[in-house]
Swiss-Prot record:
The keyword Oxidoreductase does not apply. SUPFAM superfamilies: Ecotin, trypsin inhibitor (SSF49772). The gene is eco. It comes from the Bacteria. It is found in: Periplasm. It comes from Pseudomonas aeruginosa (strain LESB58). Pfam families: Ecotin. The keyword NADP does not apply. This is Ecotin. Keywords: Disulfide bond, Periplasm, Protease inhibitor, Serine protease inhibitor, Signal. The record marks 99-100 as: Reactive bond. GO terms for molecular function: serine-type endopeptidase inhibitor activity. HAMAP family: Ecotin.
């Protein structure tokens, strides 16, 4: 009897975990051909309004000593009937680069970020951040937090 209760408990927990993961993605459309759907699940924070999420999309490319960037815009879309936001990075241009001489330096594989508008998002641990990006683009992220110290401007 005890073994049966343990087995039933394990089965219930595993099906709940699977259902929770699937339910979070159900309303979001599948990725179009040539795109991937990349998902970020944020941990709950106290005072989430003091946090932001920076989306850092990019590609790993061979690069020299110059500063390199890709161009693009992360566009917010709303899931009809649900009101959930998702984000789409349609076009990635570049790379753009500074033009310094790099004598004697070998090129190496580096992560080159996409810069543009829309990459700083509100922190909300209740919903996943869903990003559709071209297949050759990797999505990374960074959490920003505000200092509790607030400074006062000086009249001049």
């Amino acid at each position: 009897m005890k073994a049966l209760l343990i087995a039933a408990g394990v089965a219930a927990l595993s099906s709940t975990a699977m259902a929770a993961k699937l339910d979070e993605k159900v309303p979001y459309p599948k990725a179009d051909a040539g795109f991937t759907r990349q998902v970020i699940h944020l941990p709950k924070q106290d005072a989430e309004d003091a946090f932001k999420v920076e989306i850092i999309a990019g590609k790993t490319l061979e690069a020299d000593c110059n500063q390199q960037r890709l161009g693009g815009e992360l566009e917010e879309h709303t899931l009809e009937g649900w009101g959930y936001s998702y984000y789409r990075l349609d076009k990635v241009s570049g790379p753009m680069s500074t033009m310094m001489a790099c004598p004697g330096q070998k090129k190496e594989q580096r992560f080159i970020p996409v810069v543009g508008e829309g990459f700083l998002l509100r922190y909300n641990s209740k919903l996943p951040i869903v990003v559709y990006a071209p297949k050759d683009v990797e999505v990374r992220y960074r959490i920003w937090s505000a200092s509790e110290k607030v400074e006062k401007a000086v009249s001049e």
